[in-house]
């Protein structure tokens, strides 16, 4: 699939390789939050492993060199429900959101802490509590981004029960 602009906003489309026929998989209308008249301006997106959900990255902000902070939304394909993640967290503060292997959760970083959000209920669980000025969880500092091209510092376990992550204490650095 690919992201294309239309008169009404961003659309996600697929092309049949043999015929070149274009099919809109997700319309701009489906990407319009309830009560709004404009669709989300998508910077990036990823499908869940079973293609039943779409994770959309929007409203992005730069951290060091790249737009890695922003807002994330999930579109459930079965019922067309569009839900913003991270309710109660600061606008454009989420980073590196990713589906759990079974697609029932999304984990992300906000203000140097890692969170997990259950998609069926919207319940958000803060997994790390010590993130702040000198403690970084689930992402990297400037040196890692600049010298090693590392930005995203956490991964789901294959069974989706755990998250492995980088933890840095930059005090005195």
Describe each PLM feature range:
Residues 1-173:
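Beta-propeller folds
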């Amino acid at each position: 699939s690919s992201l294309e602009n239309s008169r009404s906003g961003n659309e996600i489309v697929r092309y049949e390789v043999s015929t070149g026929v274009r099919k809109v998989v997700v319309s701009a209308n489906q990407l319009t939050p309830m009560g709004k008249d404009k669709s989300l301006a998508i910077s990036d997106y990823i499908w869940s492993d079973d293609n039943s959900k779409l994770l959309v990255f929007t409203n992005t902000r730069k951290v060091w060199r790249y737009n890695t902070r922003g807002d994330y939304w999930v579109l459930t394909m079965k019922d067309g429900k569009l839900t913003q993640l991270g309710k109660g967290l600061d606008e454009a503060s989420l980073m590196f959101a990713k589906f759990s292997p079974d697609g029932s959760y999304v984990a992300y970083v906000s203000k140097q802490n890692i969170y997990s959000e259950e998609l069926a209920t919207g319940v958000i669980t803060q997994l790390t509590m010590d993130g702040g000025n000198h403690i970084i969880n689930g992402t990297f500092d400037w040196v890692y981004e600049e010298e090693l091209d590392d930005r995203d510092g956490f991964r789901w376990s294959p069974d989706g029960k755990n998250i492995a992550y980088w933890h840095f204490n930059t005090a005195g650095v």
